[in-house]
Amino acid sequence: MQREIHISTGADTHTLHSSGMPDPHVFQFYHRAMDILEAAGIDYAVGGAYALAVHTGIVRHTKDFDVFLKKESLPDALAAFEREGLRTHVTHPHWIAKAFSPDGELFVDLIYSSGNGICRVDDEWLASAVPGEVLGRPAPLCAAEEILWSKSFIQERERFDGADVAHLLLKRGEKLNWDRLLARFGGNALVLFSHLVLFRFIYPSEPSPAPPRVYDFLLEQFRSQPVSKEKVCRGTLLSWSQYLIDVEEWGYADPRLRPRGNFTADQIETWTRAEK
């Protein structure tokens, strides 16, 4: 069941599709992509820049359009786009595919997991989507909790989404379902804790976005975490590139590998080679 969302950010959906609006062919293609998915009966939620704009008021128009769906729905989604004459490509089999506009200039990202394999799109992700508008068209939007969860792990040299996380905490912190968010992070809750610490540094004049019990829980996690008996570097969950030396030369285990993670060695090698 979808829940209503009321956001006071100084930029509502009307502002989003009347100020800095992209070229008509851009949003026409995005509208068409959503029409195709809905006609095929595929559950999805819009994320990326357009969902972030609704949740925070930060407007960024990009040439890609992020649609989140379950991996089980991907074959039907690709087939639906191809029936409409759109070229598709499974960019990285473990988390993302694309559907391209006829001229190849625009594309839709079909996302069903995260690059690190942690943030998989599941029934809860789609059931928690909130009703909204994307460039004047009704559309389900990824909930703030899922956006924050997935963005918290993006800490590459060339892309760090910490500012997006801080802005989500600033604009949506009081309304977040913190129990659900903690459950999403699970054993990686210290990543959330690190962003809450950064928030306190970034916004010293703002109240804490999380209730005291959340800080108590995370502080206890921090204090009680024992030193791992296994020599492991969890940095690869934050950046595919910046911790390669740890797992390739310094003898640290890679937590992305099974059974600890979701990847085989071949999958990691393929992913790393493609990103390089």
Question: Which ranges hold each PLM region?
Answer:
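Short aromatic/hydrophobic-glycine micro-motifs
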Residues: 42, 85-87, 174
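Conserved catalytic core of two-metal-ion nucleotidyltransferases
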Residues: 82-122
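Catalytic cores of NTP-dependent nucleotidyl/adenyl transfer enzymes across multiple folds
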Residues: 4-9, 13, 120-276
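Active-site nucleotide-donor binding segment shared across nucleotidyl transfer reactions
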Residues: 31-65, 69-78, 143, 251-276
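Anion (oxyanion) recognition and catalysis
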Residues: 38, 82, 133
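Helical scaffold of the NTase/Pol beta-like nucleotidyltransferase catalytic core
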Residues: 1-46
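Short, hinge-like loop/turn segments at secondary-structure boundaries
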Residues: 62-64, 86, 107-108, 127
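Short, flexible active-site-adjacent loop segments at beta-strand->alpha-helix junctions, enriched
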Residues: 50, 73, 114-116, 138, ...
